[in-house]
């Protein structure tokens, strides 16, 4: 399971790297392809996972890569006891609602807020550079 997940992240990260060398902004479709592939693999690994998008325009390639990196760190940290993961992406932020046995407070940083409520972790990061900014 871990190898499948890691392989997916490596593939998508490499793809985003090459795209970012050519384009500053990526269309919504590329964001969706990136996150949707991760969601499919997380589901294949036996964790309930879904995503909803509230995006209205292109996003900086560097932001898409950063969102994928955060998703990777969260899933790796929680992998042994990850029960469910719900992802919400808008132009201004990405929210991860994580039900897991792991402690996720270490993820907190100036760019990432982490809260635990009713047994769920809410991991949130702001997104800059959406829709032509």
Question: What are the language-model segments listed below?
Answer:
Residues 55, 102, 127-129:
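Beta-strand elements of well-folded, non-transmembrane domains
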Residues 84-100, 116:
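Short beta-strand/loop element within the Bergerat-fold HATPase_c
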Residues 29-63:
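Helix-loop-beta hinge of the Bergerat
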Residues 42-43, 77-79, 108:
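Alpha-helix C-terminal capping segments
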Residues 61-89:
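Conserved ATP-binding N-box helix of the HATPase_c
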Residues 1-39, 71:
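Signal-transmission coiled-coils
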Residues 47-51, 85-87, 112-114:
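Generic structural motif
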